[in-house]
A protein has these predicted regions:
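Extracytoplasmic metal-acquisition and chelation regions
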Residues: 2-3, 8-11, 25-236
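N-terminal signal peptide c-region/cleavage motif recognized by signal peptidases
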Residues: 20-22
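Bacterial N-terminal signal peptides
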Residues: 10-18
Length: 236
């Protein structure tokens, strides 16, 4: 599936961008944050650093929509201060498991809040996942929105360190902007402006204004590229 393919990419990017926060005093424990899957966990680490301890609900490689909560899930959420989910229909079970935890301190945060979704154009994807492409974290601007929402949630859950979370977000945002500038400069002089994305959001990361798009749905983990499609790409 597309999500499975790109969660690791998003995680690596977030880790590479993370800067260190000042460590807590030895007697002060980091707040516990539950994240729905790896990409959300890495964004939490990017703005939370040593001030947070992050636990992921969905095992690596598993699909969010196939997730079934366990007793361990409930125990984790009863102890957590924040639950971070992506949204855009990726975790339809989020509100239910948050309520089941019966933890009045638990703050449910939808990282994509305020973002405008990219619409799915593949009929199979629409039938399976809905009209919105949920892979917001793959876009540099999308990652910025999600990181900001997470930082603000952490600031509310841990007000003593609110400024530290906001400072870390500012650093993270600056590095995202540097990456965007670098990629824009590299693509500006590309003569053959042709790009095959496995998800439309990769076009946003690359810069849609300077690349032409030919999305090819055979580029996914569950499908092998068709010979006719491959020949078409080679001749482009």
């Amino acid at each position: 599936m597309q999500r499975r393919k790109f969660v690791e990419m998003g995680a690596v990017c977030a880790l590479a961008l993370t800067a260190a926060l000042p460590a807590r005093a030895e007697a002060e424990r980091p707040i516990l944050v539950a994240a729905s899957f790896d990409a959300m966990a890495e964004l939490v680490k990017a703005v939370g650093g040593s001030l947070v301890r992050v636990e992921t609900l969905i095992p690596p490689g598993a699909e969010p929509h196939d997730f079934t909560p366990t007793v361990k899930t409930t125990q984790l959420l009863r102890a957590a201060s924040v639950l971070v989910v992506n949204g855009f229909g990726m975790e339809p079970w989020a509100k239910k498991i948050a309520a089941a935890a019966e933890n009045p301190r638990l703050m449910l945060v939808t990282a994509s809040e305020g973002a405008v979704s990219v619409k799915n154009s593949d009929p199979d994807e629409i039938a399976e996942h809905g009209a919105d492409d949920p892979h917001l974290w793959l876009s540099l601007s999308g990652a910025e929105i999600e990181a900001r929402n997470i930082a603000e949630a952490l600031a509310k859950a841990d007000p003593k360190n609110a400024e530290a979370y906001r400072m870390q977000f500012t650093l993270f945002k600056g590095k995202l902007h540097v990456l965007k500038t670098q990629y824009s400069a590299r693509f500006r002089n590309v003569k053959r402006r042709f790009f095959v994305p496995a998800t439309p959001l990769l076009l946003i990361s690359a810069g849609t204004s300077i690349l032409s798009r030919r999305a090819w749905k055979a580029f996914s983990q569950r499908e092998n590229p068709r010979r006719s499609g491959s020949q078409s790409l080679q001749s482009s």
